[in-house]
Amino acid sequence: MSKLDYGFNIPALKVMKLKEIQTPCLLSDYETFKINVEKMRSFTHENNIKLRPHAKMHKSVEVAKYQLQYGNASGICCQKLSEAEVFVSSGIKDILITNQITDL
């Protein structure tokens, strides 16, 4: 196990009680999520622009990969180098770190 493997791989199911869900956990209506990604893909395609979604809301490799594959995204943004490391280790290569990196 590398330092990037955190072990949070237990999916939350609709039948689970809130106290049974391992946290932190991203909960989303998958159909609405897909519709929103498609709307952004259509908008960016029609206006000849690229989207670079920020991963700070979801912090999810799976969501970022979906946005890249289906959402006309040119890459992703994240806040910190440690977040970028997780995305790079999962195969995402086009990442913009939106904060300054210092040696402090």
Residues of each region from the PLM?
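N-terminal hydrophobic targeting/anchoring segments and the immediately downstream early-domain regions
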Residues: 1-7
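Serine/threonine-rich low-complexity intrinsically disordered regions
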Residues: 2, 17, 70-72
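N-terminal glycine-rich anion-binding loops that anchor highly charged ligand groups
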Residues: 8-13, 32-65
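Generic N-terminal amphipathic, Lys/Arg-enriched alpha-helix
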Residues: 9-28
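Bulky hydrophobic/aromatic packing residues
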Residues: 14-18, 43, 74
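A generic short-segment signal for beta-strand/edge and adjacent turn/coil regions
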Residues: 20-23, 44-46, 64-66, 92
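Active-site mouth loops of central-metabolism enzymes
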Residues: 22-30, 50-54, 70-76
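Active-site-proximal beta-alpha core segment in soluble small-molecule metabolic enzymes
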Residues: 54-104
